[in-house]
């Protein structure tokens, strides 16, 4: 479904160029219920699956919500709970979020914010109308998250009512940092997007933001707030793209509050197998079981000499203890590697590669070994994430909308030809 750009209220695709949203159940095409809203309906379906299972047998359930992926949409009562909450704008809110995370002990007091990318707009440069729209978009995002929280709570309440919660380990986490997608651009690109919105029947009025037939996103500036105090957001190798919270509770899990030791996504399966008492060969997994740390038997899943890595379309990172090397490609990065000490600088503001050349080179060599081991293909500028995404979208747009483009070009050509003829006729009359 996600590859075809599904919305939250119906099967209408939001991605330009997508012809239909395809939903499947048990490998077979299916249709949505009439009153579909993504978080509510997906939780309803998960409850049905749990109820249909054998209560005497263990179960594994994976609930992948659309919240808060674009298009951000939420019932109006959730959105209106945040009236005025974001009127101060993203510059103020990013600073507030930094201080709040420090006050709550989520990051060290030495944490500072990386400068916002030059392409980000300053809040004070926006018109009053632009500020109102931007604040409302962030309200929709907050409402969507609260709606998701409510429906996750319904699932947990159901497990508790059926006597299964006390014997169930629950993990709640995100797949990546905040999404920076936007639904308006500058110049001709925006004219083209407005034409697509008109063709597809989107209602982008202020009153309809986040509602049915809307096309709403928070954009890169609010994404920086959502990822703060970390740098950047989804797609990138900075902490804002990679570091997300994970909440886990259940039998055998110590109620220890905030744990700062990292857990890699590849650790999840070994952790679940370990918790369920299922024998497995650790050598067959890239990740480690985090259960010893989660149960309070150890302080961390990785010792200071162990590493783990990520790569997505040229953006990459490798972690070892308190250290991290990272590379971000354009348009937000320059494809150069940098070294950070996350124990004091999780905002990734001070590159320490020149001060620690031996460590830097050793970690680079380890990253290269990782890419060879897992088969990472090094991409060039034409294949960087955003570049490739835009090229693919443009190909789909041309394929889907070429008849409309042809009609438009013929209309423009006809108008120009008519204007030319009228002008020439007028000149002849003046000459005579």
Q: Which residues fall in each region the model found?
A:
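Beta-strand elements within well-structured catalytic alpha/beta cores of enzymes
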Residues: 46, 59-65, 141, 145-148, ...
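Active-site rim elements
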Residues: 29-37, 86-88, 137-143, 231-235, ...
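Formylglycine-dependent
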Residues: 1-88, 92, 118-143
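C-terminal cap/loop subdomain of S1 sulfatases and analogous C-terminal strand-loop tails that border
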Residues: 3-7, 211-242, 253-342, 389, ...
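Long, internal low-complexity/basic segments
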Residues: 113-119, 125-134, 268, 331-336, ...
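Histidine-centered active-site microenvironments of extracellular/periplasmic hydrolases
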Residues: 1, 73-74, 157-249, 390-399
């Amino acid at each position: 479904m996600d590859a075809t750009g599904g919305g939250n209220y119906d099967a209408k695709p939001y991605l330009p160029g997508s012809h239909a949203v395809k939903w499947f159940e048990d490998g077979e095409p299916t249709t949505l219920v009439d009153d579909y809203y993504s978080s509510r309906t997906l939780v309803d379906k998960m409850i049905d699956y749990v109820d249909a299972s054998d209560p005497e047998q263990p179960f594994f359930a994976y609930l992948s919500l659309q919240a808060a992926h674009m298009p951000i949409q939420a019932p109006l009562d959730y959105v209106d709970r945040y009236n005025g909450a974001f009127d101060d704008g993203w510059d103020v809110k990013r600073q507030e979020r930094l201080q709040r995370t420090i006050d709550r002990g989520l990051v060290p007091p030495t944490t500072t914010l990386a400068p916002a990318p030059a392409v980000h707009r300053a809040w004070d440069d926006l018109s009053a109308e632009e500020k109102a729209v931007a604040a409302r978009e962030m309200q929709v995002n907050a409402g969507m998250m609260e709606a998701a929280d409510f429906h996750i709570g319904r699932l947990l309440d159901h497990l508790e009512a059926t006597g299964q919660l006390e014997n169930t380990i629950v993990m709640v986490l995100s797949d990546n940092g905040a999404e920076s997608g936007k639904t308006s651009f500058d110049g001709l690109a925006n004219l083209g997007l407005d034409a697509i919105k008109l063709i597809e029947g989107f209602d982008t009025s202020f009153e309809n933001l986040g509602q049915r037939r809307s096309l709403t996103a928070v954009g890169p500036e609010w994404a920086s707030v959502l990822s703060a105090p970390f740098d950047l957001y989804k797609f990138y190798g900075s902490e804002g793209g990679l570091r997300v919270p994970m909440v886990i509770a259940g039998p055998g899990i110590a109620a220890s509050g905030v744990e700062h030791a990292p857990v890699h996504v590849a650790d999840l399966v070994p952790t679940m197998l370990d918790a369920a008492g299922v024998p497995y060969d650790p050598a067959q997994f890239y990740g480690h079981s985090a259960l010893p740390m989660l149960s309070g038997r150890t302080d961390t899943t990785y010792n200071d000499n162990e590493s783990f890595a990520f790569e997505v379309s040229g953006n990459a990172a490798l972690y070892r203890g308190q250290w991290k090397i990272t590379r971000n490609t354009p348009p937000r990065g320059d494809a150069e590697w940098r070294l950070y000490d996350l124990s004091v600088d999780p905002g990734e503001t001070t590159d320490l590669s020149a001060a620690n050349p031996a460590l830097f080179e050793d970690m680079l060599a380890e990253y290269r070994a990782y890419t060879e081991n897992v088969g990472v293909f090094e991409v060039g500028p034409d294949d960087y994430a955003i570049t490739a995404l835009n090229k693919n979208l443009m190909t789909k747009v041309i394929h889907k909308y070429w008849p409309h483009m042809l009609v438009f070009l013929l209309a423009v050509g006809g108008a120009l030809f008519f204007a030319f003829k009228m002008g020439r006729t007028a000149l002849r009359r003046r000459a005579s």
